[in-house]
Regions:
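Conserved phosphate- and dinucleotide-binding cores of soluble alpha/beta proteins
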Residues: 1-113
Length: 113
């Protein structure tokens, strides 16, 4: 089955956002959640939009396991809004020579592809 989350659609990203979307997500339990992220810093996962950050945070909170999928350019990038502590999700990323990635590996599982 496919479940569609309601709420408002943010036109620039086609993301469902808003209170209705959050309420619906809170009613669900996820075994695994896969999310994109705009930035991964030393301590936090970040995104530029407050409403999208709230959606992502709610999904992470309702998942047994969370995975953040990013390309190497997102490592060390910081966006406006903190989504969650780095420890809250596993990171799936391209192999990177970033020294920051070594620090992140001390805090959470990193899968390099």
């Amino acid at each position: 089955k496919t479940i569609i989350i309601g709420g408002f659609v943010k036109q620039s990203t086609d993301a469902s956002v808003g209170a209705l979307a959050i309420d619906q997500i809170r009613q669900l339990n996820f075994d695994k959640a896969f999310l994109g992220m705009n930035g991964i810093g030393k301590h936090y996962l970040t995104t530029p939009d407050v409403e999208e950050a709230t959606i992502k945070r709610t999904v992470i909170d309702n998942a047994k396991e969370s995975y953040v999928l990013v390309d190497a350019s997102k490592i060390g990038q910081f966006s406006f809004v903190k989504v969650a502590a780095i420890e809250k999700a596993n990171i799936i990323c391209q192999t990177s020579e970033s020294s920051l990635l070594d620090i992140i590996k001390e805090k959470t599982r990193v899968i390099e592809v």
